[in-house]
Amino acid sequence: MDLIPQQLKAVTLTHVRYRPGDQLGHFLAWISLVPVFISLGGFVSHFLFRRELQGIFFGIGLVISQFINEFIKTSVEQARPETCTLLEACDSHGWPSSHSQFMFFFATYFSLMGCKGIGFWFGLRSRWIMNLLHWSLAVVTMYSRVYLGYHTVAQVFAGAALGGIVGASWFWVVNSVLYPFFPVIEESVLGRWLYVKDTSHIPDVLKFEYDNARAARKDMDSAKSD
């Protein structure tokens, strides 16, 4: 007896199609993968090389936001636009857009970090440039999901609104509720083993690390010469 093959499902976050010969669609397909690049290239690299509690909780917030998105999608069960048949994406729901929610969470949280002076900020001008970059990527990602046919306009705006709300709410939780416990996390067995730290209380952490790295190198050179 022959087995009837079942329809395969795709991972919606990385499943991107565009019309052959459509250069704009090709570009926007890559833009749609920005959340993946941020997740893997950004936060994984940050944890490996920085171990900052602010960055770790930033990443945790994005994961929580994704779970909220999936819960709402499976509860509302609003279908994607008719183009989902051509895109082979009709097996997943469309409201709200997870890509839009991810990017607007990221842009909102990042902007609030800048307003609070957390992270590597080089001055007011650079802060505006960084915020412009992140908000531009968020808007273009939202547009790409409509252009490529994965979502309706209402679905991407719903994702953007939800991402902004969840991002702002999580920022408040981290910096008002959890922040007093950062020293406890740093001094815990797991925190000391993983070398996690919090430098958000340092006004110019980039200069602080630069000066300390140079001082440490000078001390090493002096020790070798003795």
UniProtKB/Swiss-Prot annotation:
GO terms for biological process: diacylglycerol biosynthetic process; pollen tube development. GO terms for molecular function: phosphatidate phosphatase activity. SUPFAM superfamilies: Acid phosphatase/Vanadium-dependent haloperoxidase. Optimum pH is 6.0-8.0. It comes from the Eukaryota. Expressed in root tips, root branch points, vascular tissue of cotyledons and leaves, pistil, anthers and filaments. Disulfide bonds: none annotated. The keyword Plastid applies. SMART domains: acidPPc (SM00014). This is Lipid phosphate phosphatase gamma. It comes from Arabidopsis thaliana (Mouse-ear cress). The gene is LPPG.
